[in-house]
């Protein structure tokens, strides 16, 4: 894992991108800007294939580049950070489409941003991810990583789930409803927010457990310290969904447990990026309708 970014020695930057009609033009724009700083662009294999070029696997890019660019939306950067969690590369999110919470730099801002970046005017945020443990009936435990959240929901449409929860090995709660969301601080502005969960400052060392449409009015979200572990069991026909990308049948597992991970993403940001201003703009806070 690279300890820091030395802007004077940056030679290679890898790009992972979501396919779009503007992809080729966006890549040309970024390449033109970075070539002016003597930086070589390397493409992830799926991106390179679209352009009939040679590319590199994501892990290879992460190990051999000074930092990575995620060109797309929040889903692209989430997938990239999950795939490279063991390597923990520096990642810059440039959005191509709807403005997200994670990819706050637009294509129109690239030239100005990189001028600031190569002048040393940037910050690195390190939001924690979530360790998710899948306890199989065979006795084997699989460890996965979540950037935003892990969600347990019914595998059948309009069906309820019954979920038992334990905290640090002690019985804690019994959820009866549409499911539960275990979210990182960054993930609290995703599905968690839609389920009326709390919004947590993204660099906090806590995580949340939020019931989805509980059948009891007394059920409320809880915010847990970083050293707590929560375990869930269910006899319902349910699914575990990690970041909306990976799905696992709960019927194949005895339990699922989660805790705040020691692993964190390393996101390159504008200097002075104001998280609460972003919340205000996206959630239309402070407006008198």
UniProtKB/Swiss-Prot annotation:
KW Nucleotide-binding (keyword) present: yes
Compartments, as annotated in UniProt: Cytoplasm
Record-linked InterPro entries: ATP-NAD_kinase_N, ATP-NAD_kinase_PpnK-typ_C, NAD/diacylglycerol_kinase_sf, NADK
EC number(s) from the headed UniProt entry: 2.7.1.23
GO cellular component entries: cytoplasm
Cofactor list: a divalent metal cation
Catalytic residues (UniProt): 74 (proton acceptor)
Domain of life: Bacteria
Gene Ontology MF, one: NAD binding
Residues reported in the UniProt entry to bind NAD(+): 74-75, 148-149, 178, 186, 189-194, 245
Record's keyword terms, sorted: ATP-binding, Cytoplasm, Kinase, NAD, NADP, Nucleotide-binding, Transferase
Group of enzyme by EC: transferase
Pfam family of the protein (one): NAD_kinase
Family annotation (NCBIfam families): PRK14077.1
Function: Involved in the regulation of the intracellular balance of NAD and NADP, and is a key enzyme in the biosynthesis of NADP. Catalyzes specifically the phosphorylation on 2'-hydroxyl of the adenosine moiety of NAD to yield NADP.
Family: Belongs to the NAD kinase family.
HAMAP family according to UniProt: NAD_kinase
Full protein name: NAD kinase
Native source species: Campylobacter curvus (strain 525.92)
Lineage: Bacteria, Pseudomonadati, Campylobacterota, Epsilonproteobacteria, Campylobacterales
Gene it is expressed from: nadK
């Amino acid at each position: 894992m690279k300890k820091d970014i030395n802007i004077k020695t940056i030679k290679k930057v890898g790009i992972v991108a979501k396919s779009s009609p503007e992809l080729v033009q966006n890549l040309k724009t970024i390449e033109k800007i970075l070539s002016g700083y003597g930086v070589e662009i390397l493409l992830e294999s799926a991106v390179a294939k679209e352009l009939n070029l040679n590319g590199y696997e994501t892990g290879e890019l992460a190990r051999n580049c000074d930092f990575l660019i995620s060109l797309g939306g929040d889903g692209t950067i989430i997938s990239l950070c999950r795939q490279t969690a063991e390597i923990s590369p520096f990642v810059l999110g440039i959005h191509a489409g709807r403005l997200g919470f994670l990819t706050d730099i637009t294509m129109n801002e690239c030239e100005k941003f990189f001028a600031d970046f190569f002048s040393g005017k940037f910050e690195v945020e390190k939001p924690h991810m979530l360790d998710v443990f899948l306890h199989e009936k065979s006795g084997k435990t699989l460890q996965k990583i979540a950037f935003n959240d892990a969600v347990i929901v019914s595998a059948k449409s309009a069906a309820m789930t019954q979920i038992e929860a334990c905290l640090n090995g002690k019985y804690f709660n019994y959820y009866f409803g549409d499911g539960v969301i275990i979210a990182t601080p960054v993930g609290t502005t995703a599905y968690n927010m839609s389920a009326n969960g709390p919004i947590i400052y993204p660099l906090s060392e806590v995580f949340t457990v939020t019931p989805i449409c509980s059948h009891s009015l007394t059920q409320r979200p809880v915010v847990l310290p970083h050293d707590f572990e929560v375990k869930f069991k269910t006899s319902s026909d349910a699914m575990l969904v990690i970041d909306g990308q990976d799905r696992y049948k709960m019927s194949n597992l005895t339990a699922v447990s989660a805790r705040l991970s020691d692993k964190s993403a390393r996101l390159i940001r504008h200097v002075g990026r104001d998280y609460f201003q972003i919340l205000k703009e996206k959630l239309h806070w402070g407006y008198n309708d």
